Structure formats: C-alpha cells, structure tokens
C-alpha cells in the first residue's frame, strides 16, 4: 500500500498564517499518477481533514499546529503501507513535517519514507542527513515516483532513476533532475477525489487558476 500524507499546517498565536492551507496540488498530481498506473494508495490530508482544529506546536509556544494531530494521522496509515510519501513545499512547514516523519518512521520502521516538494529539492542534503527521510524526489515527481515505486518493490538499483537523492552507506547520492514533461496533456489529472476539497472550498481556502506548470494566477 502507498500512503500519501499532507502534513498539518502552521499558524501563529496572532492569527498570522505561516502558509495558507490550500489544497496540496503536488500531492494531488502524484495521486493522479498512481491512479492512472493502477496502483493502490490512500491519501491523508493532515491539514484539510480538520481545518478548524489547532494544537500545541512541538517545542515552541509562539506557533500552533493546524489540522490533524500526529497521532490522528498515524492512526489513519494502513498497516500494510510499504511506501509513505510526504509533501513539503515550504521551508516554514519543514520543522513540523520533520517531527511527523520521525513519528511515522518509528511506527512504520520497514516502510520507505519519500519526501517531495520544493523544500526537499532545495536542501536534500540537510533533509537526508538530519531526518528520517529515506529518499527525496527532486523537482517534478509524477514519473519519478512511479519509477521509484517499481525499483523499491523489485529491489533494484536506485542509481538508475533520475530525479532522486538518497544515502547509501552514509554516502549521499543525487541522480540529478529528471527531464521536465513538456506536454501537459501527458500528465495525469490531479486526483482531487482523494482530498477533502469541499472542506477547503467551504472555508475559501482554494488555489488560483493554473494554466500550466507554474505558479497559479491569483
């Protein structure tokens, strides 16, 4: 089983939002790619499934955690999960995401934890050396993630997969960025059915209009 996790969000006591809790487009694209490939997966949206709840932020008293608790997220992970993908686009979300990953790794020590998103792409060296992440997907991830799943399940070499970074005997290995997909029509549509999209919409937490593989028009 493949489990995809969108971590909880971060807020301050002043009400300032560290990152607006929009629907996670990157994970939705990954879910769409898995769906088209016929692979079994589940999505846990740690923010969207409980947008109205806030909890103490681990290790700090000036921030709050928005969404599901770590325990609630972990309780939703199927026991047969062998691959757990976590998204983290913004570095402001990394401290919370890192703690979540540590707890997930402790509960599922045999599962491979894969990080995607801009934060991991930018600082994969730090992520791999200072967290429980097993593999970082660099840049566009839809095709790379599928290749990675196949290699992990077939126990074949990861060095032949473009677009990832990992540690092998404490040696950092990065295979470079994969080639960008030029034709957007070849990309699987985001699987929004796996996300609590109505929860976002009802609270006016929505994305802008995307006309390509770029920042949305707001």
Model-derived features: positions:
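Aromatic-acidic/polar surface patches that form glycan- and anion
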Residues: 19-23, 90-93
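Radical SAM [4Fe-4S] cluster-binding motif and immediate context
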Residues: 185-186, 190-218
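Residues that mark the start of a beta-strand
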Residues: 1-2, 40, 213-216
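Glycine-rich beta-alpha loop elements in corrinoid/cobalamin-binding modules
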Residues: 33-183
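A structure-centric signal for secondary-structure junctions around beta-strands
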Residues: 24, 161, 213-214
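Short catalytic helix/loop segments, enriched in acidic residues and glycine
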Residues: 20-35
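Short glycine-rich His-centered loop
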Residues: 2-21, 112
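Active-site/binding-pocket entry motifs
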Residues: 10, 181, 193-195
């Amino acid at each position: 089983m493949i489990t995809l996790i969108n971590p909880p969000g971060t807020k301050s006591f002043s009400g300032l939002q560290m990152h607006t809790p929009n629907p996670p487009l990157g994970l939705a694209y990954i879910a769409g790619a898995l769906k088209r490939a016929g692979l079994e997966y589940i999505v846990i949206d740690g923010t969207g499934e409980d947008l109205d709840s806030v909890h103490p932020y681990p290790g700090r008293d000036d921030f709050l955690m928005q969404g599901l608790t770590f325990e609630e997220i972990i309780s939703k992970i199927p026991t047969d999960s062998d691959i757990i993908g976590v998204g983290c686009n913004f570095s402001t979300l990394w401290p919370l995401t890192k703690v979540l990953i540590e707890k997930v790794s402790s509960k599922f020590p045999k599962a491979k934890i894969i990080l995607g998103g801009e934060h991991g792409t930018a600082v994969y060296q730090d992520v791999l050396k200072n967290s429980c992440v097993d593999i970082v997907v660099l840049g566009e991830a839809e095709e790379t993630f599928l290749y990675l799943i196949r290699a992990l399940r077939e126990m074949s070499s990861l060095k032949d997969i473009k677009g990832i970074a990992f540690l092998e005997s404490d040696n950092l290995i990065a295979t470079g960025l994969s080639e960008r997909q030029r034709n957007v029509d070849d990309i699987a549509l985001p699987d929004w059915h796996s996300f609590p999209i109505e929860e976002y919409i009802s609270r006016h937490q929505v994305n802008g209009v995307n006309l390509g593989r770029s920042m949305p028009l707001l």
